[in-house]
């Protein structure tokens, strides 16, 4: 029997199923989505936890003309009545916004236009459909205005595009549309970083408002992202809108790998002897009521072990991003926060109020907001909830502890490079009898001293269960 391959970086469900890759069955997501039906559902999970692959699987299941054999032998195939009713029954609009970025709004809008235009182009048969009127065919053609190889939209046409496409698909098929939007919050993140946040909020609010709120041709929609952006920001007025976060028990096994799934993949590739290392380095996340491993880490490390049985665990997840959020957090830390970071690195937990609804321009306005974002994006995890609703936070595993220590080391290196300036400030503060400045500088000195010991911590992070 052919040995299946490890799907490193492959996010297309059909490719995995057709090309001999190992697949951890997450088709319970389909069943739970239909049984817990909402008009619009948003799943928030950290990056590299299988969101895009999950969305690709949903498209393969619901899309008219799908190859039903892709689901042979998978969990969902056991629910015959559900498959008969829903598999291959809907027109599906699927867009991923993970590449929508630019140094300016105009650059980002052009990328966004290309993504929308490419999806519309997949339904080019609508231009000749005998189910559409002459006017409707012209409306479709009006969505595909191309100049010099680029899709051209004015803002009004852009924001109406998904709703109009839904209407035309409904007219052609006689069936309402499923809309899937992957990584919905990436354009907002990039816009905030590059100074055009409010323009992007306005654009996405208009697009989502028409596609998800006032769309009579929508069966249901599913969105994924890392953060839950405040409903008042871009989801204004959406009814029957459900957000499923890492705090919720529903769908808690649908993204990321469970302990059982990790043991199965290790057994399949004869790597079971490495279970303890994988658990120490890549386990520790708690979604709802389930312990979860980072799938990106597990697959990458298994791939390394298959090539070299002596390979050591690496920081795969943390090295897939710049992790500027952690450095920003350390830069802004006050004395209390620095003490809390020390406790986290020592394997303890801290208790914090978590806000699950923020806007990007609120994230770094306070340390409290940064705690919330570190939790939501996977740098911290939940150990429990207090009676008054505060969340017990801890560093999930060895990999993330290494990341915090690395960022503290960078901060320490940068600040000690300015020791001469700091000493001068300290002396001036004494001469000026500026007690507040003296306290701040002395606190920073203590943090530097403590940092020297923190960056040499090497014992494994304790799992607090």
Where are these regions (language model features)?
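Phosphate-binding site recognition
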Residues: 1-454
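Single conserved hydrophobic/aromatic residue that forms the stacking wall/gate
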Residues: 455-465
């Amino acid at each position: 029997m052919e040995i299946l391959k490890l799907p490193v970086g492959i996010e297309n469900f059909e490719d995995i199923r057709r090309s001999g890759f190992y697949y951890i069955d997450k088709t319970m997501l389909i069943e739970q989505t239909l049984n817990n039906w909402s008009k619009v559902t948003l799943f928030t999970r950290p990056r590299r936890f299988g969101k895009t692959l999950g969305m690709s699987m949903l498209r393969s299941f619901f899309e008219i003309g799908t190859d039903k054999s892709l689901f042979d032998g998978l969990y969902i195939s056991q629910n015959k009545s559900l498959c008969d009713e829903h598999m291959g029954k809907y027109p599906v609009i699927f867009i991923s916004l993970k590449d929508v970025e630019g140094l300016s709004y105009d650059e980002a809008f052009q990328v966004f236009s290309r993504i929308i235009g490419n999806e519309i182009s997949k339904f080019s048969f609508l231009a000749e459909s005998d189910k559409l009127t002459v006017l409707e065919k012209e409306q479709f053609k009006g969505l595909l205005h191309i100049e010099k190889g680029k899709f051209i939209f004015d803002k009004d046409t852009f924001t109406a595009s998904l709703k109009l496409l839904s209407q035309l698909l409904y007219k052609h098929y006689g069936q309402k549309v499923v809309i899937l939007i992957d990584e919905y919050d990436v354009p907002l993140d990039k816009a905030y970083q590059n100074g055009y946040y409010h323009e992007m909020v306005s654009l996405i609010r208009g697009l989502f408002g028409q596609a998800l709120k006032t769309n009579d041709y929508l069966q249901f929609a599913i969105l994924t992202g890392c953060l839950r952006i405040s409903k008042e920001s871009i989801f204004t007025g959406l009814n029957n809108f459900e957000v499923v976060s890492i705090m919720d028990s529903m769908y808690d096994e649908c993204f990321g790998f469970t302990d059982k799934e990790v043991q199965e993949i290790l057994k399949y590739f004869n790597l079971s002897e490495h279970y303890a290392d994988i658990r120490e380095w890549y386990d520790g996340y708690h979604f709802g009521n389930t312990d979860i491993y980072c799938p990106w880490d597990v697959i990458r490390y298994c791939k390394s072990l298959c090539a070299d049985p002596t390979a050591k665990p690496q920081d795969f997840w943390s090295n897939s991003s710049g992790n500027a959020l952690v450095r920003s957090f350390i830069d802004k830390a006050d004395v209390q926060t620095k003490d809390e970071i020390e406790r986290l690195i020592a394997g303890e937990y801290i208790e914090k109020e978590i806000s699950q609804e923020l806007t990007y321009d609120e994230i770094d306005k306070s340390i409290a907001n940064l705690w919330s974002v570190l939790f939501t994006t996977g740098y911290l995890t939940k150990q429990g909830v207090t009676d008054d609703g505060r969340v017990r936070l801890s560093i999930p595993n060895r990999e993330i502890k290494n990341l915090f220590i690395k960022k503290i080391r960078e901060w320490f290196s940068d600040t000690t490079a300015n020791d001469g300036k700091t000493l001068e400030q300290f002396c001036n503060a004494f001469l000026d009898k500026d007690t507040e400045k003296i306290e701040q500088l002395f606190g920073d000195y203590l943090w530097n001293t403590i940092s020297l010991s923190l960056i040499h911590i090497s014992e494994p992070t304790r799992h607090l269960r």
